[in-house]
């Protein structure tokens, strides 16, 4: 009995080896065994399968060999490791029904059938032959159909030329033949299809037991257990169809992810740009300065001269340096001279503007200023949450500069904070104006509401603050005596300076209603009276500033100067003023 059993086992092993050798030869040469027809080569991505069943009756069992032929033509995706099968292929229904009954039991006895009792079981062997173009790599993947064969030893189910994915848009692929799991495949939809990789290279009595992923069991009822053993070429995986919808596989997926990342970055950058480009942005802030602007901070005495400012415009600069959350809204209505320079047509600063902060005595001379311009620059340096809303209707040209204060001053106004004696001289001022300075250094919560209608020409230049300075305005902070002279100013303007050093939450609302008359203009050239009034205003302003600095609360110093020629100014004010409500 033992000799008979050994003889039968040896015959079975010989037959399996022969079948494997025949399968390899047929697959590599592109030849099909007798009994099968030659398949056409002109259809790319189509599978043709034929079956050849050879029954070898033995003493205690039967042995059947099933051949499945796949014909492929020159597919560039043959380097990929997956083949996708059509879940809705109607011509494969007959093949799937052949093995629905016994596939579960065959898979349950798969382990025992490969190692033990080979003469007592019904052996079912699947040989998949692939006919097609050349293969670049020999990535082999065991099939789920191979799990139906208890005698999987020595069975060749894939060769080097079968390493391709057959993929057609909108359709799923042809299913593997002679599989009990095809019941689930034929009932599935095209969008929920799975890519079944059914390639395996078996040689020289190597046992390969593959185990598919758990999602296989959810869709394929006949897959019980498949394990993978010691084979670098043995790859079994069921990928969802959406992962393999791309023809170029993981490369396309990674490329798509990279594009999505780039798109997200671009979207983020675009969002930031749109936030800044309400007033136009050039380099992380909006800075539009026509011909020449100089900002200097000097430790020693220096002379600043501004000459021949021909025409002004409107300049809006917005910069946010915020550590918390802030909202910055700037609404500007102007009727002065506007012309587009650079981007978004919102930058027009006078040809040469100099801002200087001096520690020692210096001399500032402003000459030949013909016209001002309008410049609005907004910046927030806030460590908490703040809302800054500035609404500035302007009719004439205003040039304002702000540093740590709110200041309404004419084109020939200087602000100084002196520890020692200082002399302020204003000469040759043709037209007077009104100067208001307000400074807040607040560590709590504050609200500042200032209503400022302006008629003169405004030019706002701001560095880390909101500023509106005339074309010939200097601000100086001197520790020692200094001298300032302003000469030959043709037109006056009004500058508004506001700064809030806030560590908590703050709100700045600066509407500019056209209610009160803040600007004094003299069309007939009464320069001596203007100079005298302005000198008084500055002295009064210094007093108000010292009182303001003593108390760290809301300090708004408003100085109004009644003029003797009020009727003439009122008439001129009404003529020059075109109210714009925001």
UniProtKB/Swiss-Prot annotation:
S-S bridge residues: none
Task: Point to the regions of Polar residues compositional bias.
Answer: 31-40, 137-159, 325-335, 379-397, 439-457, 487-496, 506-524
Source domain of life = Eukaryota
Composition-biased stretches, type Basic and acidic residues, lie in 336-345, 525-552, 559-582
Name by which UniProt lists this protein = Semenogelin-2
Q: What does this protein do?
A: Participates in the formation of a gel matrix (sperm coagulum) entrapping the accessory gland secretions and ejaculated spermatozoa.
Location(s) in or outside the cell: Secreted
Which stretches does the entry tag as region Disordered?
Answer: 26-65, 132-159, 272-295, 318-358, 379-417, 439-582
| Quaternary data | Interacts with SERPINA5.
The family line of this record is: Belongs to the semenogelin family.
**Annotated organism of origin:** Hylobates lar
